[in-house]
Amino acid sequence: MANTYMKPGDQTFDELIGDIRHGVYLKTFMEWNIDDKRFNERYVGHEAYLIENGELTSYVRNPVLELTTPKLYSSVDAVSKEMEFDAGTCGKGDPMQGAPVYEGGPSVRLRNIRLGGGA
């Protein structure tokens, strides 16, 4: 298992969202997957908020981001300077096996992507 982190940028979080007219901030994920070729990715938000005119407003339920790795990297518009990491577990197999991992990094602003929604 490999982890890749974005290099921190030069903006604060408030600067990162300050010029977003309408968007969604996915703060944490309840599901994230990438295929064996490291090409197709899927992220389901756990804690997510609507961004309206540069401000976090209401809660967004289970937003889904599905895209390819090239689309992810080409959509990065800005990266915050704050880094945040949390302990997690990567689990696979039958019987289930888990490996301790750290997840996180800076907040990243993506442009020109679409989100779906879940129930």
Whereabouts are the PLM-identified features?
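N-terminal small-residue-enriched
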Residues: 1-119
